[in-house]
């Protein structure tokens, strides 16, 4: 199961408010329908991913995903200061993670993403949070090695009071798995795990599938990938042998 903590920039009263059209030109400039905004979001994530400390040997390069963005925008439009349901942000059978950010002013997307990443100051690779109450899940999702699709949305929510600019990014496949949360990527020389599939320190050999059951490795040894059960439920294990997943 993915660890889906409530990860919020600031706390506020949770009430169902409807979005409105932001009058601030700064808000309009943040629309994810703009190609330059999509590029900014992707580039910011990739810049942070390729410069993690310690460096990563298996970090996938992120790309914009329109289906993920649609889900993120739909959730942002609800103006709810809480995470969406897992089924509402899934893309097909693929589970997706989510980061939320709220602000009193229309901050740039780069600033919002940097805010999530700044939780790294409370995180130690291989150990986890430095203190029991530290929030680090935004950071670990941003740098989760196998999350390679990103889509975001933003809404203007004036009835939320001070925090009226609502940013949502969703990531597929989801990160923050409990058994790996302290090591969100594999430490090593950049692209060491993806020779021949490297772009400026990030791996490009992503897997488009996700195993639907947890024991695909053992099932493959017992029945082989030609078995109908594995064809349906173990596509990652059977079709992504030389890919990062």
Curated annotation (Swiss-Prot):
Residues 42-171 form the SCP domain. Coiled coil: none annotated. SMART domains: SCP. One of its GO terms (biological process) is sexual reproduction. Disulfide bonds join 191-198, 194-203, 207-240, 216-234, 225-238. Residues 1-22 form the signal peptide. Belongs to the CRISP family. It comes from the Eukaryota. It is found in: Secreted. This is Cysteine-rich secretory protein 3. The keyword Signal applies. Residues 207-240 form the ShKT domain. Expressed in the salivary gland, in the ampulla and the seminal vesicle. InterPro entries: Allrgn_V5/Tpx1_CS, CAP_dom, CAP_sf, Crisp-like_dom, CRISP-related, Cysteine_rich_secretory, SCP_CRISP, ShKT_dom. Interacts with A1BG. GO terms for cellular component: extracellular region; extracellular space; specific granule. Keywords: Disulfide bond, Secreted, Signal. The lineage of its organism: Eukaryota, Metazoa, Chordata, Craniata, Vertebrata. Its main location: secreted.
């Amino acid at each position: 199961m993915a660890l889906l903590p409530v990860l919020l920039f600031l706390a506020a009263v949770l009430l169902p408010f409807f979005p409105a059209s932001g009058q601030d030109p700064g808000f309009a400039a943040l629309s994810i329908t703009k190609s330059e905004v999509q590029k900014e979001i992707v580039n910011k994530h990739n810049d942070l991913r390729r410069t993690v400390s310690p460096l990563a040997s298996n970090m996938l390069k992120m790309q914009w995903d329109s289906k993920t963005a649609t889900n993120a925008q739909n959730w942002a439009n609800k103006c709810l200061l809480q995470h969406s349901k897992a089924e509402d942000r899934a893309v097909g059978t693929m589970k997706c993670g989510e980061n939320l950010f709220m602000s009193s002013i229309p901050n740039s997307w780069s600033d919002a993403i940097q805010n999530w990443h700044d939780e790294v100051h409370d995180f130690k690779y291989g150990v986890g949070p430095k203190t029991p109450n530290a929030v680090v899940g935004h950071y670990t999702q941003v740098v989760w090695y196998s999350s390679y699709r990103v889509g975001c949305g933003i809404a203007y929510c004036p009835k939320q009071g001070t925090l009226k600019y609502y940013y949502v990014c969703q990531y597929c496949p989801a990160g923050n798995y409990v058994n790996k949360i302290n090591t969100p990527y594999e430490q090593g020389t950049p692209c060491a795990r993806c020779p021949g599939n490297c772009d400026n320190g990030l791996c490009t050999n992503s897997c488009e599938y996700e195993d639907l059951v947890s024991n695909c490795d053992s099932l493959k040894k017992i029945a082989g990938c030609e078995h109908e059960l594995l064809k349906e439920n173990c596509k990652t294990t059977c079709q992504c042998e030389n890919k990062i997943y």
